[in-house]
């Protein structure tokens, strides 16, 4: 009997304590929710932000297409501008290259001409000397002494001609040749039945060439 009374007392005590335990659990749950409320709110805001961003990205299809077309047009315009600049630079390069090639060829020709005709100035200075030799050698010697002098002059004259010949200097052929204004300088026209018209009949002064360049044309008489 006493044992049954103890069990009943324990049951009553449990029933009294149960509401208090449930209340404590409820309070703990509320406290936990209050503590985590800011975090939950932040998560909600982030989720809403993501949804808004997705909506913005999707946006109006027509507007998005228009923006794409504008971007494409701007890109095409930039490409066209760059292509025009490249074309301009290519043309400038080609012009510079052509100018350089012309300069290089001209310089090479000038250097070759300078080497080829390096003796021209000296030859031009020697021509009056040759003229004097030729005039002196036409003099008829009256005695042995004069003949000896003329022979010595002729030797010197021949030596000078040989030296000039080694440099490419040669006399221009004149008498009996058709008149050539590039080689001959006509100072007189005469009638001469021994020659065809427009033929050199007499040479008044020798002409000379340095290789293929006329240093001095021959001074001549030409038949009519």
UniProtKB/Swiss-Prot annotation:
Disordered: annotated span? 1-72
Q: What is this protein called?
A: Protein GrpE
Record's subcellular location:
Cytoplasm
GO MF annotations in UniProt: adenyl-nucleotide exchange factor activity; protein homodimerization activity; protein-folding chaperone binding; unfolded protein binding
Task: Relate the assembly described in the record.
Answer: Homodimer.
Alphabetized SUPFAM superfamilies for the sequence: Coiled-coil domain of nucleotide exchange factor GrpE, Head domain of nucleotide exchange factor GrpE
Residue spans making up a coiled coil are none
Q: Does the keyword Cytoplasm apply?
A: yes
Q: Tell me the organism.
A: Parageobacillus thermoglucosidasius
GO term, biological process aspect, one = protein folding
Quote the InterPro entries the UniProt record gives. Answer: GrpE, GrpE_coiled_coil, GrpE_head
**Compositional bias of kind Polar residues:** 10-19
């Amino acid at each position: 009997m006493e044992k049954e009374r103890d069990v009943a007392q324990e049951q009553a005590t449990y029933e009294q304590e149960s509401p208090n335990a449930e209340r404590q659990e409820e309070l703990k749950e509320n406290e936990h929710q209050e503590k985590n409320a800011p975090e939950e709110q932040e998560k909600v805001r982030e989720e809403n932000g993501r949804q808004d961003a997705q909506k913005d990205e999707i946006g109006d299809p027509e507007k998005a297409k228009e923006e794409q077309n504008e971007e494409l047009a701007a890109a095409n315009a930039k490409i066209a501008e760059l292509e025009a600049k490249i074309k301009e630079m290519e043309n400038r390069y080609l012009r510079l290259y052509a100018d350089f090639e012309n300069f290089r060829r001209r310089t090479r020709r000038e250097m070759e001409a300078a080497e080829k005709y390096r003796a021209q100035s000296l030859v031009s200075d020697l021509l009056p000397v040759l003229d004097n030799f030729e005039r002196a050698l036409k003099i008829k010697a009256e005695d042995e002494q004069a003949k000896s002098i003329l022979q010595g002059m002729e030797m010197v004259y021949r030596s000078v001609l040989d030296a000039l010949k080694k440099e490419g200097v040669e006399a221009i052929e004149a008498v009996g040749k058709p008149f050539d204004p590039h080689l001959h300088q006509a100072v007189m026209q005469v009638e001469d039945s021994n020659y065809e018209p427009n033929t050199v009949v007499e040479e008044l002064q020798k002409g000379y060439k340095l290789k293929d360049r006329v240093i001095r044309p021959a001074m001549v008489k030409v038949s009519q």
